[in-house]
């Protein structure tokens, strides 16, 4: 039996349920009688840790079978919040500016708030279903609800979602680590050496850092690394905000051959060269002055100055640097999947819940509320200021867009290092639920084995390395996985498990009507988003896109 299942979850009545008082009173009696019989085994546990998530239906034999698993959680409220926040944050934050560019500011904010609220509601359904269903393992909830098909459905969804998440982290390493190494070595461009090849680098990082961290036995050990990862992401958001006020619009494009910047414009305009105030930067910025000449220069002098500087310039459209509030195009299809992918933490909710100290459903819901709200604020800031920096020129991986502007910039170099460290330390967190799913499916009653523990981690990491090397752009990871498995985990599975396993509420109760509406919304969203993405692939195939 998996150690994450049925570990002393509080069974206080649900305040949200009008039928909360209907929980069997006989449960307390059963719990007390069994507690007396096993008092020596649970001598060091508090009263709550001796209650089992069984709804009073387990007999003495099953209680005895579960006895070894019923030990209290040891992870603090703060560490649990760090772990869940880190699971939410991931690399989705790097794709949000791209989503805003293809939805507009107002539409993006509405969608972001809606997805955050729906994610909170989904966690509420999942936690309540875990209590009523008697398991803290996603696959076993599926098995109790629909038998073997439900177990397989949960397994496939968790595996696809977390493999997509791991792949997106490795994509960041593939794209950003060569740029960091190139900057440290003072190279103006990638020379093609093996140590600047992202495919080689992700293999080295996977074997040297990710695999050893993935061999830890418990998820709680990663609480401190989660806190450090979040600190790195806070630093990332801070620098994105700071750079918004340094990079002018229209976007300066670095000409590596002469060390200057050029604009993508077509008509003459007046520009003034401004030094970049960032330390050790090899870049000069150009500001657009369309209504006056550079100070002290007449028209001919200005033109001569521009000719001598080697700057290429063209006029830009009037609205190129104007923010868009509502945007609808073929890329809008990727916006909602990217947002959904950014808020997925559901495979980690139950493992974190199982390790929460003095756990209760309400306490875990508070952890979820704090984590999702905090990430909502960080997402909004990163998306808004990233979009207002690059507007329509933003890329699907935000940090990669800055390479258009800088050859070397100390704050951005530090940001890239921070993000690389953060995503590298996050990979083991999303690997844990996949390994648990594999063990639950293939080795449900086997004792713990270090060899199996190692081999599953090694195979998963190897498969992700192959995927990252073969898939050309990160957007298709975010879009397709977000539209399929992420919607299963956020919308569909929690709703159907709730409808099936929560017996004490009638089907016409407000709680189940809400879950049914939630299920229908999830189905329509998944079908619609995947259809739009497939249509976009047909008419604008991936090989024709350059990022």
From Swiss-Prot:
pH dependence text: Optimum pH is 7.5-8.5.
Disordered as annotated region, ranges: 1-30
Sugar-modified residues: 260, 264, 276
GO biological process: amino acid transmembrane transport; amino acid transport; L-alanine import across plasma membrane; neutral amino acid transport
Tissue specificity: Expressed almost exclusively in embryonic and adult liver, and at lower levels in the kidney. Expressed at lower levels in adult muscle and pancreas. Detected in fetal blood vessels. Expressed in syncytiotrophoblas of placenta during first trimester and at term. Highly expressed in first trimester placenta compared to term placenta.
A Pfam match: Aa_trans
Residues flagged as site, Influences on amino acid transport capacity: 232
Ranges of the Extracellular topological domain: 1-104, 173-195, 242-332, 391-411, 475-476, 536-547
Main location: membrane
Coiled-coil region(s): none
PTM-bearing positions, type Phosphoserine: 49
Transmembrane segments: 105-125, 152-172, 196-216, 221-241, 333-353, 370-390, 412-432, 454-474, 477-497, 515-535
The reaction(s) this protein catalyses: L-methionine(in) + Na(+)(in) = L-methionine(out) + Na(+)(out); L-asparagine(in) + Na(+)(in) = L-asparagine(out) + Na(+)(out); L-threonine(in) + Na(+)(in) = L-threonine(out) + Na(+)(out); L-serine(in) + Na(+)(in) = L-serine(out) + Na(+)(out)
Chain's role: Symporter that cotransports neutral amino acids and sodium ions from the extraccellular to the intracellular side of the cell membrane. The transport is electrogenic, pH dependent and partially tolerates substitution of Na(+) by Li(+). Preferentially transports smaller amino acids, such as glycine, L-alanine, L-serine, L-asparagine and L-threonine, followed by L-cysteine, L-histidine, L-proline and L-glutamine and L-methionine.
Family: Belongs to the amino acid/polyamine transporter 2 family.
Name this protein carries in UniProt: Sodium-coupled neutral amino acid transporter 4
Originating gene: SLC38A4
């Amino acid at each position: 039996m998996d150690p994450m299942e049925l570990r002393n979850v509080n069974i206080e009545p649900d305040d949200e349920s009008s039928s909360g008082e209907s929980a069997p009173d006989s449960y307390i009696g059963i719990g007390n009688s069994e507690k007396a019989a096993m008092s020596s085994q649970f001598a060091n546990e508090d009263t709550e840790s001796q209650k089992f998530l069984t709804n009073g239906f387990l007999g003495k034999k099953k209680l005895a079978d579960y006895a070894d698993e019923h030990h209290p959680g040891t992870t603090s409220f703060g560490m649990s919040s760090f772990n869940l926040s880190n699971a939410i944050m991931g690399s989705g934050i790097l794709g949000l500016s791209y989503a805003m560019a293809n939805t507009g500011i107002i539409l993006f904010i509405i969608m972001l708030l809606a997805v955050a609220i729906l994610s909170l509601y989904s966690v509420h359904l999942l936690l309540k279903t875990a209590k009523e269903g008697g398991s803290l393992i996603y696959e076993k909830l599926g098995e109790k609800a629909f038998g073997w098909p439900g177990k397989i459905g949960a397994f496939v969804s968790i595996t696809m979602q977390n493999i997509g998440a791991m792949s997106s982290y490795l994509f960041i390493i593939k794209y950003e680590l060569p740029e960091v190494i190139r900057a440290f070595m003072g190279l103006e461009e990638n020379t093609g050496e093996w140590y600047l090849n992202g495919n080689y680098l992700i293999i080295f990082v996977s074997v040297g850092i990710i695999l050893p961290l993935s061999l830890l036995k418990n998820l709680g050990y990663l609480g401190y690394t989660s806190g450090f990862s979040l600190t790195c992401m806070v630093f990332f958001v801070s620098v994105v905000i700071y750079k918004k006020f340094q990079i002018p619009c229209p976007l300066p494009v670095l000409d590596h051959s002469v060390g200057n910047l050029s604009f993508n414009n077509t008509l003459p305009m007046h520009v003034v060269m401004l030094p970049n105030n960032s330390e050790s930067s090899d870049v000069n910025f150009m500001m657009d002055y369309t209504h006056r000449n550079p100070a002290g220069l007449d028209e001919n002098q200005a033109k001569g100055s521009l000719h001598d500087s080697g700057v290429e310039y063209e006029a830009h459209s009037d609205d190129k640097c104007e923010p868009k509030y509502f945007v609808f195009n073929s890329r809008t299809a990727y916006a909602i999947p990217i947002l959904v992918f950014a808020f997925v933490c559901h495979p980690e909710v139950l493992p974190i819940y199982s390790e929460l100290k003095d756990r209760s459903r309400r306490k875990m819901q508070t952890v979820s509320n704090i984590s999702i709200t905090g990430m909502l604020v960080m997402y909004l800031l990163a998306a808004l200021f990233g979009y207002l920096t690059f507007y329509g020129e933003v890329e699907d991986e935000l940090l990669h867009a800055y390479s258009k502007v800088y050859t070397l910039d100390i704050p951005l170099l530090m940001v890239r290092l921070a993000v690389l460290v953060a995503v590298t330390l996050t990979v083991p967190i999303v690997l844990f639920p996949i390994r648990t799913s594999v063990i639950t499916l293939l080795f449900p009653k086997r004792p713990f084995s270090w060899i199996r523990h190692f081999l599953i981690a090694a195979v998963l990491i190897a498969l992700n390395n192959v995927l990252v090397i073969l898939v050309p752009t990160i957007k298709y990871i975010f879009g397709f996985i977000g539209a399929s498995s992420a919607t299963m985990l956020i919308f569909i599975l929690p709703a159907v498990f709730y409808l099936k396993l929560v017996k004490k509420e009638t089907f016409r109760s407000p709680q189940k009507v809400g879950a049914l509406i939630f299920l229908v919304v999830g189905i329509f969203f998944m079908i619609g988003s995947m259809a739009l993405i497939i249509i976009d692939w047909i008419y604008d195939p991936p090989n024709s896109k350059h990022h």
